[in-house]
């Protein structure tokens, strides 16, 4: 049985939807290491940064793929980045967001180090002109 159709998930959806002003789904297969899974032990006790990408009309699929692969390649270049998964959005409730990124850090302050890192800044300068929008969420996982 899929997660989406599981009775417990359906029960939660029925409870949340009436209270939800707006939502955005992000389901994807990671670019790069196929065995990377959220929820693994190495995620516990960390700080998570998630970002959804919506590209402008006219940005080709090849350009998008190149940018997302470049983002995925940051994993080995920025020491504070403990985990990075990037992938194409597979959610049916995507609100136009085509790709997503989930980054994991040891602590919240490491996100600022990542944000200011020259490799990240170089990527940001390259991708910003191509984006129609983005959505970010930074959090400490529940239960850690």
Annotate each language-model stretch with its function.
Residues 1-10, 21-99, 106-116, 121, ...:
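Short S/T/G/P-rich N-terminal loop/turn motif that feeds into the first structured element of a domain
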């Amino acid at each position: 049985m899929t997660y989406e159709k599981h009775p417990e998930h359906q029960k939660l959806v029925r409870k949340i939807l009436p209270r939800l002003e707006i939502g955005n789904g992000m389901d994807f297969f990671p670019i790069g290491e196929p065995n990377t899974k959220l929820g693994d032990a190495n995620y516990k006790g960390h700080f998570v940064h998630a970002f959804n990408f919506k590209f402008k009309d006219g940005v080709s699929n090849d350009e998008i793929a190149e940018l997302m692969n470049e983002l995925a390649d940051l994993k080995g270049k920025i020491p504070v980045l403990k985990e990075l998964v990037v992938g194409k959005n597979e959610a049916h409730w995507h609100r136009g967001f085509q790709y997503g990124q989930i980054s994991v850090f040891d602590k919240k302050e490491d996100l600022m180090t990542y944000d200011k890192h020259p490799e990240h800044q170089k990527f940001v300068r390259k991708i910003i002109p191509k984006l129609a929008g983005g959505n970010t969420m930074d959090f400490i996982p529940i239960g850690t």
